[in-house]
Amino acid sequence: MFNFTRQYSVKDGLITDELASHIVENLPARYASAETWKRIYSLQHDGASLQTMYLACEKEKARSGHPKGACILAVRDTDGDVFGVFIPDYLIPAPHYFGSEETFLWKYFPPKKYVHYPFVGNSNFVAYCTKSFLAFGGGNGRYSLWLDGSLEYAYSSRTPAFENNPLSYRGCPDQRIQIVDIELWVLE
């Protein structure tokens, strides 16, 4: 079993030890050895605001002194499914797409079903952060994961960037997903 240190006590957090062990199996080697996973944003504790999440990233970037940070975004929907993304960058608004081939999507359906979608490179649309939405993957007019600025809902569709199935268990592309919780973690 993978052991990691949590910066905060997260008794009911989205990333359980079991889920963390699945994510670690897919992390690039330089991040898989991270000993500390620090939660820098939680919708339940910090409020439903994309701007607050971006501000948490900016503060962490300034604190760490590193231009890039390894982030794990976890989302829980009203069906209880948890899904998200690993990206080796801070989530900060930019006027263009950013990210690398190390980025991947994942979904976790209790009990114990984990699916990993690596970046396949059929487009350069990895991540796009704006003041009004946050998106991962792109192409054909869709996003692999799109979250609105109020963090109340999301959409998920198959895209050329990840060739993923929709991340919500319902599996219906372009159907609104109601968000219950979001957490953003950085690896140190």
From Swiss-Prot:
All copies of domain TLDc, residue ranges: 13-188
Superkingdom per UniProt: Eukaryota
Pfam families the record matches: TLD (PF07534)
Subcellular location per the Swiss-Prot or TrEMBL entry: Mitochondrion; Cytoplasm; Nucleus
Alphabetized GO MF terms: ATPase inhibitor activity
GO biological process: meiotic cell cycle; regulation of cellular pH
Key words of the record: Cytoplasm, Meiosis, Mitochondrion, Nucleus
GO CC annotation, single: proton-transporting V-type ATPase complex
Main location: mitochondrion
Family per similarity comment: Belongs to the OXR1 family.
PANTHER family: MUSTARD, ISOFORM V, NUCLEOLAR PROTEIN 7/ESTROGEN RECEPTOR COACTIVATOR-RELATED
Record's function text: May be involved in protection from oxidative damage. Has a role in meiosis.
Protein's recorded name: Oxidation resistance protein 1
Gene for this chain: oxr1
